């Protein structure tokens, strides 16, 4: 099961030197994220603003209940950055169009967010918007329907520390984050294809 309102945004930019950088927030060495181990992502869902705030990233490892869904939906966003201030967030679903119903595993998304938070990958986003050092994280949405059936959706989270949650500037940053996710994903896919061609 995937969220509604799938939206694919394109970008000509591609990440450079994937897998050759140093440590990122969250305990991941991007050099450990070997190309063949990185997940394939072809589509990125429009950012979903979460009606939640956290006192700091240290409080985001536990599920938080959304009031907008009659207490049937919770989120764990697993943020980790260099700011100990309040934050709000967007949930961004991702999937591979060849198998859109397949759930992307949390460890795969954790590796992917390490690439996204790499300083060189983040450079353009940080120049255009006021963001912290590691705004991306691997997140989970938990749902429980009227019959008590539970489901989960793993995705990516983009969090923000701005003083006016979900303002125009905040949304612009989230949309740029969505485009960055797709750009990096396409760069990984292209690099994998080149690698396969070189092995022939």
UniProtKB/Swiss-Prot annotation:
Keyword Cytoplasm: no
Stored InterPro entries: Herpes_UL55 (IPR007622)
Organism listed in the record: Equine herpesvirus 1 (strain Ab4p)
Protein name (record): Tegument protein UL55 homolog
Broad class of where this protein is predominantly found: virion
Family assignment from sequence similarity: Belongs to the alphaherpesvirinae HHV-1 UL55 family.
Location in the cell: Virion tegument; Host nucleus matrix
Cellular component terms (Gene Ontology): host cell nuclear matrix; viral tegument
Ranges of biased composition (kind: Basic and acidic residues): 1-20
Keywords, ordered alphabetically: Host nucleus, Virion, Virion tegument
Region: Disordered, residue numbers: 1-23
GO biological process, one term: viral life cycle
């Amino acid at each position: 099961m995937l969220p509604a309102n799938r939206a694919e945004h394109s970008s000509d930019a591609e990440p450079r030197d994937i897998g050759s950088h140093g440590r990122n927030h969250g305990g991941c060495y991007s050099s450990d994220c070997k190309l063949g181990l990185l997940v394939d992502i072809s589509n990125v869902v429009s950012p979903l603003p979460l009606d939640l705030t956290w006192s700091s990233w240290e409080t985001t490892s536990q599920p938080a209940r959304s009031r907008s869904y009659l207490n049937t939906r919770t989120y764990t966003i697993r943020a980790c950055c260099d700011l100990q201030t309040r934050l709000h967030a967007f949930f961004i679903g991702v999937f591979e169009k060849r198998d859109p119903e397949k759930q992307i595993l949390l460890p795969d998304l954790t590796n992917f967010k390490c690439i996204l938070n790499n300083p060189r990958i983040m450079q353009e986003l940080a120049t255009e918007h006021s963001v912290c050092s590691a705004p991306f994280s691997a997140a989970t949405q938990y749902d429980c329907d009227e019959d008590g059936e539970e489901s989960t959706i793993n995705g990516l989270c983009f969090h923000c520390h701005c003083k006016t949650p979900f303002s125009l500037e905040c949304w612009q940053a989230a949309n740029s984050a969505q485009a960055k996710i797709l750009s990096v994903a396409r760069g990984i896919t292209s690099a994998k294809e080149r690698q396969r061609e070189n092995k022939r």
